[in-house]
Amino acid sequence: RLALTKESLCAFEYSTEWLNSGFSISPFELPLRSGVFIAKPRPFDGGFGVFDDCLPDGWGLLILDRYLQRNGVNPQTLSLLDRLALVGSTGRGALEFRPDKSVVSKQEYADFEKLALEAEQILDSDNYNGEGIEEFQYRGGSPGGARPKIFTRYDGKEWLVKFRAKRDSKQIGEDEYCYSLLAKECGIEMPETRLFEDKYFGVERFDRILNGKLHVVSVAGLIGADYRLPSIDYLHIFKVCAALTHNVAEIWKVYRLMVFNYLIDNKDDHAKNFAFIYRDDDWHFAPAYDLLPSDGING
């Protein structure tokens, strides 16, 4: 159960049913016990990290706010609970929020060329508020990260497909696909990847299984790290992995990914680009994602 205090801080309590049969959705921040948890003001604007992971940021936040404006709603008037309700059942991982005020999600195969052009229009103009806004919102407006992206269904699987951002090279999709193949050759666990229409990078969603969802939490969400700042290093991730999984094989996954990021000069390896996934009644280091050479100070 979720509520807001008079200071606009998130209050959370596990239900009796979940206490009897569930697991901690965020072991360091929300251990599985009775009682009310109150969030800190920072770094998640009065929320808990595990719920902040479900909210759109970057591109997704841009799309949501313009979608709201297009429909006569001032985004500045929404509370944290309002925004979680807009995520509803469409967010990353297994968490769902009630009341569910999310828009109906389109999962059918998309016209990628048209969407890529609409993404360029949206990014090129602060005032663009055309139909492309609703199209992206209907196709999964909640994904995080800076690059335009959608969710789609193809070949019986759910995929995340990315488009080029303003500063990206024209072959960014081909580049990310090649690095995903290289990562797999290096023994790094990744979901299936492919190029749609020979230029749009797609990755199968690892938080979705047949007729179900898997719970996922980023390192930022787990330990309350501000991913916008260079606030953690790999030692923190090793410690989180050891504490959650108690499994040396999982720690080796972190090590391989650390070395790979260093060798490809990926400086976008911030706290939201690592995650843990709960499956088979245990925690595991999540498959890798966002593997590209990148500049930045927040890695």
Describe the predicted segments one by one.
Residues 1-299:
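Phosphate/dinucleotide-binding and metal-coordinating scaffold of catalytic cores
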